[in-house]
């Protein structure tokens, strides 16, 4: 799949990022991950991101990363394109990017580098180095320490033909509008704020109709139904989903830092697809919080 074909796929439909399965000892659980992918693939997501943020990329060892990407690519070979999360220091990000390409990933989600503060020029050089190390398409994730400006994104687009997507995790509307207007159809644009459904209608109005769904991991039918309501501008249905599910969900998610990942794993367990515990420094939901989530999920009906 060439970068432009990937760009076309990412320009419509719902995207998601499966959680990564761990066993009770916290090690990668391949069989559980395969079962998860086989369950989710038929629901109709346009693409899945393996080892992304919700997949706990930040806690994976290099050897685990290879096994996770290979498992995802092999399992979904005939059903849905797999993009691989990459990130961290530049040389590490390049190694992961090249490994994901070797294993058959159709594209990459370039997550922010960690901890080190850097100038805009330095971040742009980091993105360019990763893009030029591979031939497959790359989506850059503006979030936390990665805050690329429209001017730098325009320069990167000129220098890196395989940079085909921009994912926004900042929620800076002025910046998002500026990037969308400046870059036009050069990129596919993805909404990437945590629990992106809450912002989906607003982002669609800005020209960003595509987003990645975390709740697809445990209420996939609801996630797809909500996406279709957004796509057809059914404001009444969208409002009902937000009132009945997403706002109560946020009340649980916002109880502790890091719960944006933990609550997804809790939901998967309640749905019958236990992915095991999160890895430190994240913490799992408490039993009471799991009960609250289970009650909320039960109200949504069979998935």
UniProtKB/Swiss-Prot annotation:
The protein's name is: Probable 5-dehydro-4-deoxyglucarate dehydratase
- Give the pathway: Carbohydrate acid metabolism; D-glucarate degradation; 2,5-dioxopentanoate from D-glucarate: step 2/2
Catalytic activity as recorded in UniProt? 5-dehydro-4-deoxy-D-glucarate + H(+) = 2,5-dioxopentanoate + CO2 + H2O
- Sorted alphabetically, which PANTHER family does this protein's record hold? 5-DEHYDRO-4-DEOXYGLUCARATE DEHYDRATASE 2-RELATED, DIHYDRODIPICOLINATE SYNTHASE
EC annotation? 4.2.1.41
Gene3D superfamilies per UniProt: Aldolase class I
Annotated organism of origin:
Pseudomonas savastanoi pv. phaseolicola (strain 1448A / Race 6)
Question: What Pfam family is a match for this entry?
Answer: DHDPS
Q: Say which domain of life the source belongs to.
A: Bacteria
Q: Which family does it belong to?
A: Belongs to the DapA family.
- Which CDD domains has this protein been placed in? KDGDH
């Amino acid at each position: 799949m060439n970068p432009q074909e990937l760009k076309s796929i990412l320009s419509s439909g719902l995207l998601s990022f499966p959680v990564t399965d761990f066993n009770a000892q916290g090690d990668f659980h391949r069989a559980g991950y395969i079962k998860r992918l086989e369950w989710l693939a038929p629901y109709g997501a346009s693409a899945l991101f393996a080892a992304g943020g919700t997949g706990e990329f930040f806690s994976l060892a290099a050897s685990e990363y290879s096994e996770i990407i290979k498992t995802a690519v092999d399992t979904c070979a005939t059903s849905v394109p797999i993009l691989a999360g990459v990130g961290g220091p530049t040389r590490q990000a390049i190694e992961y990017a090249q490994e994901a390409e070797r294993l058959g990933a159709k594209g990459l989600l370039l997550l922010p580098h960690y901890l080190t503060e850097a100038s805009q020029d330095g971040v742009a050089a980091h993105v360019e180095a990763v893009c030029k190390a591979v031939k497959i398409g790359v989506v850059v994730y503006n979030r936390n320490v990665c805050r690329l400006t429209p001017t730098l994104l325009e320069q990167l687009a000129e220098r890196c033909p395989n940079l085909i997507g921009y994912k926004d995790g900042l929620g800076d509307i002025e910046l998002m509008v500026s990037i969308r207007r400046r870059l036009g159809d050069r990129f596919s644009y993805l909404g990437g704020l945590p629990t992106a459904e809450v912002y989906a209608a607003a982002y669609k109005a800005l020209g960003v109709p595509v987003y990645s769904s975390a709740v697809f991991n445990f209420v996939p039918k609801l996630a797809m139904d909500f996406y279709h309501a957004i796509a057809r501008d059914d404001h009444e249905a969208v409002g009902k989903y937000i009132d009945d599910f997403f706002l109560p969900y946020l009340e649980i998610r916002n109880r502790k830092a890091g719960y944006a990942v933990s609550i997804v794993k809790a939901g998967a367990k309640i749905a019958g697809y236990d992915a095991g515990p999160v890895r430190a420094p994240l913490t799992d939901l408490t039993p009471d919080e799991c009960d609250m989530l289970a009650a909320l999920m039960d109200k949504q009906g069979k998935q």
